[in-house]
UniProtKB/Swiss-Prot annotation:
<dbReference type="GO" id="GO:0006308">
    <property type="term" value="P:DNA catabolic process"/>
</dbReference>
<dbReference type="GO" id="GO:0005737">
    <property type="term" value="C:cytoplasm"/>
</dbReference>
<dbReference type="GO" id="GO:0009318">
    <property type="term" value="C:exodeoxyribonuclease VII complex"/>
</dbReference>
<protein>
    <recommendedName>
        <fullName>Exodeoxyribonuclease 7 large subunit</fullName>
        <ecNumber>3.1.11.6</ecNumber>
    </recommendedName>
</protein>
<keyword id="KW-0269">Exonuclease</keyword>
<dbReference type="Pfam" id="PF13742">
    <property type="entry name" value="tRNA_anti_2"/>
</dbReference>
<keyword id="KW-0963">Cytoplasm</keyword>
<keyword id="KW-0378">Hydrolase</keyword>
<dbReference type="InterPro" id="IPR025824">
    <property type="entry name" value="OB-fold_nuc-bd_dom"/>
</dbReference>
<dbReference type="Pfam" id="PF02601">
    <property type="entry name" value="Exonuc_VII_L"/>
</dbReference>
<comment type="subunit">
    <text>Heterooligomer composed of large and small subunits.</text>
</comment>
<comment type="function">
    <text>Bidirectionally degrades single-stranded DNA into large acid-insoluble oligonucleotides, which are then degraded further into small acid-soluble oligonucleotides.</text>
</comment>
<comment type="similarity">
    <text>Belongs to the XseA family.</text>
</comment>
<keyword id="KW-0540">Nuclease</keyword>
<dbReference type="GO" id="GO:0003676">
    <property type="term" value="F:nucleic acid binding"/>
</dbReference>
<dbReference type="InterPro" id="IPR020579">
    <property type="entry name" value="Exonuc_VII_lsu_C"/>
</dbReference>
<dbReference type="GO" id="GO:0008855">
    <property type="term" value="F:exodeoxyribonuclease VII activity"/>
</dbReference>
Length: 387
């Protein structure tokens, strides 16, 4: 028997009897090879074992592995025939004492925070009266429908464009990045990144490091509205504003039309009171001057003062008239814009968009048997062309 044959037989025997092992220990001498494989030692107080984790396995590890970290490894024992060395081949690795996702979240949060990506000095203010907003979310989600309800009931002077994206799974982060970068180039006043509630695993794509760095570079103010109030994602910290829910994002961004009209009424009343006060103050001053000049019998000064007062009164009346006319004109413009938006919403209420395999299709290009999706402003239906 040759040495090679002996090593191969020993390898087969070892892998047969130890095809699955669960071992807990401390990582030491970790080497990340250029091939993508990891080589390290796993040790406790008394012993150490050489270990390896190939690229296709370590790519599934979500947290950052470091020397000194306590981990549990799932794998098998084997022998590396060229050297005859006995080693542990890891298929899966989990941290000890804390969940894998929680550790990965805390590590990334600390890393980005130390780099300054969460610093308040980089936060862009949200527009007070937005005219054009992008919504990046799944168009089939309940969260999107809830947002539309708030839009239709609260403020109709703003244009909304939705960017359909995955919001869950391995491909979601890359898809979201693509949609955010596309929206950022289109001159929106704000972007809303939204998703409804879900488990930590469901929301994990919003903890992607590449996504966080892209959000930080966006020129457009962005609102992160992911999950429920208790759910925190990395996107919440790096965005310009965090809303508790997708519905809350619409409330945070959109002013209430009724509140705007009430504010205009209040402003007009305050302005009117201010002008009345100015008039009264001027008349009081005039009376004091007249009283003072009576004893001096200099009617010429009184006439001059009266003339000055009349001029000031005329100027003030012209100013008041101008201000009131400007305010009335602005209110009229506001009402006209509001009416046009209302008519637009009514006119397009029953318009639909046809998609086949995610692509917008004209009606004349559809064939019998095609499976299509029909979208309106408030719903979606699936159908099959029969004739």
């Amino acid at each position: 028997m040759t040495v090679s044959e002996l090593n191969e037989q020993a390898k087969a025997l070892l892998e047969t009897h130890f095809s699955f092992v669960e071992v807990t220990g401390e990582i030491s001498r970790l080497i990340r090879h250029s091939s993508g494989h990891w080589y390290f030692s796993l040790k406790d107080e008394k012993s150490v074992i050489s270990s390896a984790m190939y690229k296709f396995s370590n790519q599934q590890v979500k947290f950052e592995v470091k020397d000194g970290m306590q981990v549990t490894i799932y794998g098998k024992l084997t022998i590396y025939p060229p050297s005859g060395s006995y080693q542990l081949l890891a298929n899966k690795m989990l941290p000890v004492g804390i969940g894998e996702l929680e550790l990965a979240f805390n590590q990334l949060k600390s890393k980005l925070e130390n780099e300054g990506l969460f610093d308040i000095k980089f936060k862009k203010p949200l527009p007070k009266f937005p005219k054009k907003i992008a919504i990046v979310t799944s168009l089939t989600s309940a969260a999107y429908q809830d947002m539309l309800k708030v839009i239709n009931s609260r403020y109709k002077l703003c244009e909304f464009i939705a960017f359909n994206t995955l919001v869950q799974g391995e491909m979601a982060a890359a898809n979201i990045i693509q949609m955010l970068q596309k929206a950022d180039k289109m001159g929106f006043d704000a972007i809303v990144l939204a998703r409804g509630g879900g488990s930590k695993e469901d929301l994990w794509c919003f903890n992607d490091e590449n996504l966080a760095r892209v959000i930080f570079t966006l020129k457009t103010p962005i609102v992160s509205a992911v999950g429920h109030e208790i759910d925190y994602c990395i996107s919440d910290f790096v965005s310009d504003h965090r809303s508790l829910t997708p519905t809350a994002a619409m409330v945070d961004l959109l002013p209430d039309a009724n509140t705007i009209l009430q504010s205009l009424d209040i402003a007009f009343d305050k302005f009117e009171s201010f002008i009345d006060g100015k008039f009264q103050n001027s008349f009081n001053i005039l009376n004091l001057i007249n009283q003072s000049l009576k004893n001096q019998a200099i009617s010429q000064k009184i006439e001059k003062a009266n003339l000055t007062l009349e001029n000031k009164k005329a100027n003030l009346e012209n100013l008041i008239t101008s201000k009131i006319n400007n305010l009335a004109h602005k209110i009229k413009e506001f009402e006209l814009v509001f009416d046009r938006q209302e008519q637009f919403f009514k006119a397009t209420k029953n318009m639909v968009q046809i998609e086949k395999n995610g692509k917008i299709m004209p009606l004349h290009e559809l064939q019998i048997g095609d499976e299509i999706s029909i979208y309106s402003q408030i719903t979606k239906k699936n159908a099959i062309i029969k004739s």
